[in-house]
Regions:
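ATP-dependent NMP and nucleoside kinases share a basic, alpha-helical "lid"
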Residues: 131-183
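Conserved lysine of the Walker
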Residues: 44
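Small-molecule kinase domains that catalyze NTP-dependent phosphoryl transfer to phosphate-bearing small molecules
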Residues: 1, 153, 183-197
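Extreme N-terminal, non-catalytic leader segments
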Residues: 1-35, 40
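Hydrophobic positions on the alpha1 helix immediately C-terminal to the Walker A/P-loop
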Residues: 47
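Post-Walker A helix-loop "phosphate-sensing" segment adjacent to the P-loop in P-loop NTPases
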Residues: 53-63
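Conserved nucleotide-sensing/catalytic segment adjacent to the nucleotide-binding pocket
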Residues: 63-66, 70-125
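Active-site signature of alpha/beta-hydrolase-fold catalytic machinery across serine-
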Residues: 50
Length: 197
């Protein structure tokens, strides 16, 4: 696409498009699950939204789900330590597999793949660590795009038909990460820099 300085996809297997199209056309009940992952602030959500716009422009039904909503509720831990930054400084790794509700994520993905809708949790990324159970209504559409670090964890990665890894230059990621940490996640810049490093 001309509006991007660098290509979105470095390489696409030539047989992929053919297999992808045949799978959707030949099996009307089949759901296609696409997992998009990459390091923090690599552009997973942005790419996901671009895919959604493109698919909707083609008048095809699509659902989008973020694995960030499957973070464990850590509100009590944050209260205990006073704030998220102190909790992290004491060894809590928000990107570790144990920080996610992976069994629930797997179950929800399999339910979507079977053609049934789900009520997904909603994690509130404002520094409180609150996760609200069954808060988001997600429809099982023909194409289901799931983005987030957790998509490629061992517990769930086999559920996806297509897996995409987003690779972004480190300086771009750092700038995005710091901006998001301060403006969206209620962190101060000093602690956000510490978390990045």
């Amino acid at each position: 696409d001309k509006k991007y300085d660098t290509p979105i996809f470095k390489e696409v297997n030539p047989n992929f498009i053919s297999r992808f199209t045949k799978r959707l056309i030949n099996n009307p009940t089949k759901r296609l699950l696409v997992g998009i992952t990459g390091e923090s602030a690599s552009g997973k959500s942005t790419i996901c939204q671009e895919i959604k716009k493109t698919i909707e422009h083609l008048n095809m039904p699509i659902s989008v789900l973020s694995t960030d909503n499957y973070f464990n509720d850590i509100s009590e831990l944050i209260k205990k330590y006073g704030c998220f930054d102190t909790l992290r400084d004491n060894g809590y790794d928000i990107d570790a597999p144990e920080s996610f509700q992976l069994q629930l994520l797997r179950s929800d993905l399999l339910t979507l793949a079977s053609g049934k809708n789900i009520m997904a949790p909603r994690y509130i990324p404002n520094g409180t660590g609150v996760s609200v159970p069954r808060a988001l209504d997600v429809n099982s559409q023909k194409i289901i795009v799931v983005e987030g670090i957790a998509t490629m964890y061992e517990e769930v990665r086999d559920v996806f038909d297509v897996k995409v890894y987003i690779e972004t230059e480190n300086d771009i990621r750092k700038e995005r990460f710091l901006k998001r940490a301060v403006t969206e996640r209620n962190q101060n810049e000093e602690n956000a820099i510490k978390q990045w490093e």
